[in-house]
């Protein structure tokens, strides 16, 4: 689909950058010659907009071998960022999709500045082409035909092989993020823990990864009482899923991802209200993020060792469901007093973290739609983060900045640890109260990471959006897929 050329050679549509400068760029000036000065007139009349994310369509009327030009407003060069570029190109590709364009090109060099080189632009363009045009996979009987972009040409004077490589990496990042989106959007009667495990196994087999899927009896043998407690009320069997990618000859410096895989969350006996329960099919967003990252890793084959662990079940009410006041024993041996059955994700993750360590993880990153508290604190754009190791956190932070998936660190103080350790009956309690709820959840998980370098990512606010946006429709976002993959790709770099 993606190709590289030095010159335009007849396309339905070409995407061109337009900055808010006193003079037209050399690329636009060259086009203006073919248009006999008409582009300059359109700019002066403000019919070509340079405002950020503005899309201006100009028909060539036979003046060039391109049918239409789509000028993408980027604002002033000094405020130009990768985030600006992603949003603007996302809108541009959605515009092309609405016009049913099948053959398009991008004048890559017109987007290059001192801040962003052609490789950056190529990566983002290919990534955003997938993200921006993603459509919800629905179960409607009346399905409309989708017109796909079949050919996309990057026009540049830069090295073709380097640009092709960047396009490939960007495309893989976008596609894997969309895979995660599709998982999160699936209804819970379709995506059970068993189906999630089957998906993970297919992924592992496709990319020649080792894998393990523990059944209930094996979990009992290993003492995974926290995950099993959450599963107690369900007719669906639990799964502890592990994918193992060996990118080095020696099994060392292993990065462990742990993704929350609660396929539906009613809250259990600490029952959610109706409005709080609808949408809880997305409570496995952490698992989807981890699987999306493993898809990228499988495609790009970085020289790193990676484990992905997903504790999966639903959390429902029944005569056998676990209850507030229960005391359970986790795989780590630590006992937990259950004060809230709707704080089930941290219980599943506790055993997931311990299992990842057992499999050899030297570094841990857990990802979970864990708390409403993080949404109150940070909103729907920023992922909450907590850590016991600043060096590892800095690497995660740098990866998130590269992918424009912002994270913000929340604290863990000794008094927070005292709150999760405050129980008359057990080593820990799973819900000390609403105050500092996001911090309490992360602090609880830190009790299981112990001395292993660990970062916790709470994506409750960022995993889904209520409305359409520049990088896709309402629904799942695929949050943290690209950040996790970029962390692996860059891990250990100075």
Curated annotation (Swiss-Prot):
Keyword Metal-binding belongs to the record: yes
GO MF terms, alphabetically ordered: manganese ion binding; metalloaminopeptidase activity; peptidase activity
Binding site for Mn(2+) 1: 265, 342, 344
Reactions mediated catalytically: Release of an N-terminal amino acid, Xaa-|-Yaa-, in which Xaa is preferably Leu, but may be other amino acids including Pro although not Arg or Lys, and Yaa may be Pro. Amino acid amides and methyl esters are also readily hydrolyzed, but rates on arylamides are exceedingly low; Release of an N-terminal amino acid, preferentially leucine, but not glutamic or aspartic acids
Cofactor binding note from Swiss-Prot or TrEMBL: Binds 2 manganese ions per subunit.
Cofactor: Mn(2+)
Main location: cytoplasm
BP-aspect Gene Ontology terms: proteolysis
Keywords: Aminopeptidase, Cytoplasm, Hydrolase, Manganese, Metal-binding, Protease
Residues in the signal sequence: none
Residues annotated for Mn(2+) 2 binding in this entry: 260, 265, 283, 344
Gene3D superfamilies according to UniProt: Leucine Aminopeptidase, subunit E, domain 1, Zn peptidases
Organism domain of life: Bacteria
CDD domains according to UniProt: Peptidase_M17
Residues annotated as catalytic: 272, 346
Enzyme class of the recorded protein, top EC level: hydrolase
SUPFAM superfamilies: Macro domain-like, Zn-dependent exopeptidases
Subcellular location: Cytoplasm
Enzyme Commission number(s): 3.4.11.1, 3.4.11.10
Assigned GO CC terms: cytoplasm
Function of the protein: Presumably involved in the processing and regular turnover of intracellular proteins. Catalyzes the removal of unsubstituted N-terminal amino acids from various peptides.
Family: Belongs to the peptidase M17 family.
Protein name per its UniProtKB record: Probable cytosol aminopeptidase
UniProt organism field: Bacillus cereus (strain ATCC 14579 / DSM 31 / CCUG 7414 / JCM 2152 / NBRC 15305 / NCIMB 9373 / NCTC 2599 / NRRL B-3711)
Gene: pepA
